[in-house]
């Protein structure tokens, strides 16, 4: 759908290429369809993916379908949002936070 930019869907198969090898900051929302609080974070992530298009990579990992990297990075509660730079975790937010918390995490790396 034109004009409707969605956050990138990241899978175990694409995680390394999309997240770890990115030359831009990457924000990853680990979520699941059954998770109520995830539905509060989702729209924020979608907005930020539009706002920071071209400057940062912003995506989502469905932990029910993609457990490898959730386990590797110790994601035990969702929503968990991790911020990566140069393949390393540089930020972590567990649970729901205000929009500015996520925006500032990206801004600080630009």
Label each residue range with its predicted role.
Residues 83-110:
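Non-catalytic, surface beta->alpha helical segment in thiol-disulfide oxidoreductase systems
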Residues 30-44:
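Conserved redox-active cysteine motifs that mediate thiol-disulfide chemistry
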Residues 11, 31, 57-59:
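Conserved Rossmann-like nucleotide-binding pocket used by diverse enzymes
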Residues 63-69:
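Structural microenvironment flanking redox-active thiols in thiol-disulfide oxidoreductases
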Residues 23-25, 42-61:
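Conserved helix-turn-beta segment immediately C-terminal to the redox Cys motif
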Residues 1-5:
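Short, Lys/Arg-enriched N-terminal segments with co-localized hydrophobic residues
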Residues 23-24, 30-34, 77:
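Short pre-active-site segment immediately N-terminal to redox-active cysteine/selenocysteine motifs
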Residues 8-26, 67:
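A short beta-strand-turn-helix
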């Amino acid at each position: 759908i034109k004009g409707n930019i969605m956050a990138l869907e990241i899978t175990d198969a694409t995680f390394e290429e999309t997240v770890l090898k990115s030359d831009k900051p990457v924000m990853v929302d680990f979520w699941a369809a059954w998770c109520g609080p995830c539905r509060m974070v989702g729209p924020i992530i979608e907005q930020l993916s539009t706002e920071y298009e071209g400057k940062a990579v912003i995506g989502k990992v469905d932990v029910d379908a993609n457990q490898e990297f959730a386990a590797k990075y110790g994601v035990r509660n969702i929503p968990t949002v991790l911020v990566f730079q140069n393949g390393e975790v540089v930020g972590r937010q567990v649970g729901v936070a205000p929009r500015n918390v996520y925006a500032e995490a990206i801004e600080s790396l630009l």
